[in-house]
Amino acid sequence: MLRILLASLMFSCASPALANGGAAAPVSKPAPTILIFGDSLSAGHGLANGQSWPSLLGQRLQAENSPYTVVNASISGETTAGGRTRLPAALERTKPAVVVIALGANDGLRGLPVKQLKENLVAMARVPKGARARVLLVGMRLPPNYGAAYTEEFDRAFATVAKQEKLPLLPFLLEPVAADRANFQPDGLHPVAATQSKILDHVWPALKPLLK
């Protein structure tokens, strides 16, 4: 009698599909993720929630019914050395399909060695590639007051890494807004909210081919 009761209970707890002889419902895959891994220029320094270009990217993808979601793991003040240390945990946590590496500005502003910048960018590019994530490298440029030799070497670093690691490259994140001082907050470094859609429109053609 006990065996009959147990068998009856197990059958009643089975899924409706199985109980009726049908197939189990398919398990849905998690939405693919785009990980934005940058500094204050991507973190939205001085902006309200939802105004940064990564936030606008998420809104655009949603409006287009794209399956992709955006995780913005950018941190103000981050250098490539800090990003190199932090990236493995971020990848483990988010398991992204696409990673946008947009670091290097703070290395340049602090005058850190360009050799170190390149080594860190290479290391960061290889970690997501090893996890079969697609990588977009986003470059930065410095104002001329850092000296011609340093700024030229700094500018070339991103192209060198992209070529070596066979990565798509967006040479300069702020290309569409950099020439006009009115596009920046009082600190002269961080773009205002009104420019963020222009930055996204600049990033989009380089990013879209990676959204397979």
Describe each region flagged by the PLM.
Residues 1-7:
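Sec-dependent signal peptide recognition
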Residues 14-15:
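N-terminal signal peptide c-region/cleavage motif recognized by signal peptidases
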Residues 19-20, 186:
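Intrinsically disordered, low-complexity segments enriched in small/polar residues
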Residues 20-78, 86-95:
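Serine-esterase "nucleophile elbow" of acetyl-processing enzymes
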Residues 66, 84-212:
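Alpha-helical cap/lid subdomain in secreted, periplasmic
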Residues 81:
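Short, mixed-charge aromatic SLiMs
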